[in-house]
């Protein structure tokens, strides 16, 4: 019974063979999912019906989850403030998460770093609270989606944001980078 659990940090960290169905878990009180599936090499199960509405940090959540490629479009991430390295080195992840309300997120550094397959639209994201986009799309070899609608006026850090993102060829002329 997970109905009273508030912290799931590192729950399946480095559990290389874990690939069980946990889709029915009650996660409605969880506030911390950081590193939950980090380096869970085999995990590729549905989580789309999870209630993540109270989660504040998803830092490293799927970092190195090299097999994971499941829809997450139903997630309510409106309370999340930290998505640093969330999909870093999640090599197969390529799902549409454009519907996410990321308006409270401050840190998106390394979020898709080395997510080699990721190439989904993110133009509907409200990134107006984000301050750190360091290496956000670094080594995303396939990513080439429009981001010109983003309000990046609070962003301070963009080092290597598109480093080795060899497919990226989008106009960013509407970006206000005066705080960088």
Residues covered by each model-derived region:
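Negatively charged
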Residues: 1-180
